[in-house]
Amino acid sequence: MKEKELIVYRKLKEDKLLRDMAWLMEHYKDEYFNLEDREELFYECIHNILEKATHHGFYGNLWHCYLANLLVNDENSYSLACEIKGETEGTLSSVAFHDFAIIKEFLDYDFSGMEEMFGKDVLAFIKNFEGNKEKSHVYNRRIRDCICDVARSIGAADSAEEIKKIVTDFYAAYGVGKFGLNKSFRISHPEGKEMEVKAIKNIDHVKLEDLVGYEIPKQKLIANTEAFVQGKPANNCLLFGDAGTGKSSSIKGIINKYYDQGLRMIEVYKHQFQDLNDVIAQIKNRNYKFIIYMDDLSFEEFEIEYKYLKAIIEGGLEVKPDNVLIYATSNRRHLVREKYSDKEERRDDLHSSDTVQEKLSLVARFGVSIFFCAPDKKEFQNIVKVLAKRNDIHMEEDELLLEANKWELAHGGLSGRTAQQFIDYLLGLEPGRIVKNA
């Protein structure tokens, strides 16, 4: 096989399983090598294909799925040029065609000789594999199904040009690599290694419609985000207000709503602000829109991290890229804590107004501030009724609201979070008290 001749997709030849399969395709009949060693490598390859398939949730022709997965994850000059934008013209496209011709040889390989050589029909397992279509430890089901569709299409393709078009269309629709195939990310510091932006696999699939009420703040957030994903001017957003009012849920709903339009989100904690420049360097040239998300953001008077954040948002020599915004949630309107004792200290400050402005200037760098207030009693009861109906909870309304009032008095007061916790409590009661339809 010609994997050593790959140019644009050269990183594929570093994949051990592909190398082993390529070696078997060339040498499985070569008597120079011990038969037992060849047979052991054959079974090891089949084992690894099955392991990867079950981990990813693949089904159908697993060999084709494996190759398709390599292609959609390979970040190279061609795939990056095509992500979100589509086919690129010129010499790069011609060089990519050369590689797809080699990939077609892997797709079309006839394994019947190996089966005859080793006397086993085990390859039948991977040609039409029926896996658990509900589970994938790597991708969400939609992306997993798309990769399986790509595998099916490239396996049936008549030419390298057709394979190239199928894969390129995937890049245009979904992107490539970790940023293309995942919604949300976090910063990781593996021991002894550099900072990494890692995909978050298990995300909360909350929708904006799931958040009962708060229509005005939700619409403000939607309007700003839609402008951003459409390439129009948009602002950094600060969502502030009472605890449990849906600030974080709204952010989660935003990424789920606009992921299909190229929106991605990176969660950053306060102690990771020093990594922001490196994060932005990794994402500024990608064809996606990135929200850097900071949850429950606030600073004590002795913390200085807010100064780094100010420089990142606006004020440093390097301009923040057009494909990056910062969204933050906080229970504090002004983010930096102030005490009455600060007034006493400012009596000795010759430029006390400058000190005040220093602490307020971070908030000013968020162009849009959206207030989420706690619901009143009537709004709280409406949230409870909507959530009860949504979860098929059947109780007399008077009893439902009476129990809800008792719950909020004992569990943190009036908020959307308290209402949801009350509903979760009801769902956990003994059957017979509550009827929940399947």
What do the predicted segments below correspond to?
Residues 1-154:
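Intrinsically disordered, low-complexity N-terminal extensions of AAA+/P-loop NTPases
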Residues 263-266, 277-321:
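Conserved nucleotide-sensing/catalytic segment adjacent to the nucleotide-binding pocket
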Residues 347-360, 367-381:
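Conserved AAA+ ATPase "SRH/arginine-finger" region at the nucleotide-binding site
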Residues 369, 373-438:
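C-terminal alpha-helical "lid" subdomain
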